[in-house]
Curated annotation (Swiss-Prot):
Free-text function comment from the UniProt entry: Probable mitochondrial mRNA stabilization factor.
Disulphide bridges, residue numbers: none
Family: Belongs to the ATP25 family.
GO process terms (BP): mitochondrial gene expression; mRNA stabilization
InterPro entries named in the record: Atp25, NT_sf
Alphabetically ordered keywords of this record: Membrane, Mitochondrion, Mitochondrion inner membrane, Transit peptide
Pfam families recorded: RsfS
GO terms under cellular component: mitochondrial inner membrane
Naturally occurring in which organism (per UniProt): Clavispora lusitaniae (strain ATCC 42720) (Yeast)
Residue spans crossing the bilayer: none
Protein name in the entry: ATPase synthesis protein 25, mitochondrial
Length: 600
């Protein structure tokens, strides 16, 4: 066990300002005489020296004196974990940085190389040899430490480490652009937000060493040590329940209520810890382990709150997505409806809770492995959804409204089709092509099966929602989702009709028009459908009679400028790829387009 000490402020030498030093000299200048003109004894010299020191100390402000720290304040002892002899020197270096430079406490080191061979976190199962866990004082403290650690690794090892959970509160111009790009995308069915504070858990990975920095409440809640410890040390990291005791103190009633709150909080933390362990399981996890976690969760599910019921639904949903043979879709539905059978639901306002749960349930219907590629599965999914909505709102004065959650409408549209071939080109693929120059090739034919009647119903719902909520119009991401759905289903007539209607209804600026044409070019180039590429070049490149306008006129109106260099490169590359689909004789009419694109 290594013992280090943080520097005591009293031992740091204080540099006085020049003005203070000059002032001290002037105070004693009248007493200084040449040696030949004065004869003084040693005692007089010592007395003068002592007087000068006292004058200097009196003249100094208190914050510049050396004795500003009380002698009663002890140095804080830092205990570092024992370092195995086979550990690389970086382990000791990182431990010292955490303790002495960054001020972390309660530091632990876990050696993955000493775990049993069948352990999940054995070094040959994971790309990690050592794990360091430390506690920070606050989220801001952890962010500062993570930033310093990243700078240290960058300058000393010439490497940019992988850091997760580090979130800056500042909004840079590049972040604003990313947020704007993200706003154009449709909501993802697999997106999850667990409401944890930013920088409460930051992970840095470098050269086989993971460094976890957590706040004390988050570390106690997750109990990560139980995942990486040796089997014989598991009891050391088990979380003990809080024990209450009777008291005749006058405030015992208040303390009792406080104790109950802590007990519920502890139960919630246990459920979250079990849920985290379930998420950490590998894809091929044994059925016995999943059943053990399932039983452990149900045993800990006592005095449930509304939050606990929501966590239970997420737990069963995760189990169903991983092993539908172990947990059926009907069981997940029962876990969802159990929330509204509890006494807590009668006391709370469940208006927003209902619409959020319906949104999560739609995500479940989209992601469930039991969904096949036939149109009948779409009808079955909508039937299940209608029954859930009916159950939640039958004996309620509330009315179901899609306006209360902006994610719901895109998810309902996503529920109208099933994928039959991969990949299916979507908005994210177009974004990757523009931002990262990553192209995805797909089959030119239909890659999804679409339930046209259900799609028509959702369009009617969107139209009704637009009429009943003035000022509410379908977002650009939703319109693009609908457009790409028609293209992926091979319904190209509806695709171009939707494109014409969209461009006719919206009064785009020249810059917005260039962006829209770039995205449609990228999509068509990745779909690789020769007939639709030909239709685009003939009807939309420079056709004055087109309802949607033309690419050439939009470029001219914007001064042949693009919104970013990446957008320019993506446009030129996509248009070149589209023309390259044709054989040489067919390519001749488009030589003028190629020449124009080359000079952009």
């Amino acid at each position: 066990m290594l013992r280090l000490f943080r520097a005591n402020p009293s031992s740091v030498k204080v540099w006085r300002p020049i003005s203070t030093a000059v002032y001290s000299v002037r105070q004693n200048s009248s007493a200084s005489k040449p040696i030949s003109e004065s004869r003084v004894s040693i005692s007089e010299v010592e007395k003068d020296s002592k007087d000068e020191k006292e004058i200097n100390e009196v003249s100094l402000p208190w914050y510049l004196r050396d004795d500003i720290t009380s002698s009663l304040v002890e140095k804080k002892e830092i205990l570092l974990p024992e370092i195995p002899p086979h550990a690389p020197p970086q382990v000791e270096e990182f431990l010292t940085l955490m303790a002495c430079d960054y001020g972390m406490d309660n530091i632990m080191l876990f050696d993955m190389t000493q775990l049993p061979d069948d352990h999940e976190y054995k070094e040959n199962n994971k790309d990690v040899d050592f794990i360091v866990v430390a506690t920070g004082k606050s989220e801001k403290h952890i962010y500062k430490a993570a930033n310093e650690l990243r700078t240290h690794l960058k300058h000393k090892y010439n490497a940019m480490p992988s850091i997760e959970g580090m979130v800056s509160s500042a909004i840079t111009p590049s972040m604003r652009r990313r947020l704007l790009r993200r706003a154009r995308k449709g909501p993802l069915a697999t997106d999850n937000d667990y409401g944890k504070a930013a920088n409460s858990w930051v992970i840095c990975h470098h050269d086989g060493i993971d460094m976890h920095m957590l706040t004390a409440p988050r570390r106690e809640e997750l109990n990560l040590e139980s995942l990486w410890c040796k089997p014989e040390d598991a009891d050391k990291f088990s979380q003990d329940s809080f024990v209450t005791s009777e008291s005749d103190h006058i405030f015992s009633g208040i303390r009792r209520y406080h104790t109950f709150a802590r007990a519920y909080s502890s139960a919630t933390s246990d459920l979250e810890s079990i849920y985290y362990k379930l998420q950490s399981q590998p894809v091929d996890a044994a059925e016995e382990e999943l059943k053990r976690l399932q039983n452990l969760f149900e045993q800990s599910f006592s005095h449930p709150s509304i939050k606990d019921h929501g966590l239970r639904f997420q737990f069963w949903k995760t189990l169903h997505l991983a092993r539908p043979d172990l947990v059926s879709l009907a069981q997940v539905e029962d876990a969802l409806l159990a929330k509204y059978c509890s006494a807590e639901s009668l006391k709370a306002d469940m208006t927003q809770e209902k619409i959020d749960d319906i949104t999560e349930y739609v995500k479940l219907l989209i992601d469930t492995p039991t969904r096949d590629s036939h149109k009948a599965s779409v009808d079955l999914a909508f039937d299940r959804l209608s029954k859930i909505i009916s159950t939640l709102y039958t004996f309620s004065n509330e009315k179901f409204s899609v306006a209360k959650n902006p994610q719901l409408v895109p998810l309902l549209w996503r529920l109208t089709y099933v994928e039959v071939k991969e990949p299916v080109i979507g908005s994210r693929d177009v974004d990757r092509f523009i931002q990262e120059q990553v192209a995805v090739a797909t089959s030119p034919g239909p890659v999804i099966t679409m339930a046209s009647n259900r799609a028509r119903d959702i369009l009617h719902l969107i139209g009704y929602h637009t009429k009943t909520h003035p000022g509410s119009v379908p977002t650009a991401s939703l319109r693009e989702l609908i457009l790409f759905t028609y293209g992926n289903a091979g319904k190209w007539d509806k695709f171009w009709q939707e494109w014409d209607n969209y461009c006719f209804e919206k009064n785009f600026t020249p810059a917005e028009s260039v962006e829209k044409w770039t995205r449609i070019c990228v999509y068509l180039s990745m779909r690789r459908n020769k007939a639709e590429a030909l239709r685009f070049l003939e009807n939309y490149w420079n056709n004055a009679s087109s309802v949607a306008g033309s690419v050439y006129k939009s470029l001219q109106a914007n001064g042949e400028e693009f919104n970013s260099p990446d957008e320019r490169v993506a446009f030129k590359r996509a248009l070149t790829n589209m023309i390259a689909m044709f054989e040489t004789p067919e390519k001749v009419p488009f030589e003028g387009i190629l020449s124009y694109v080359d000079q952009l």
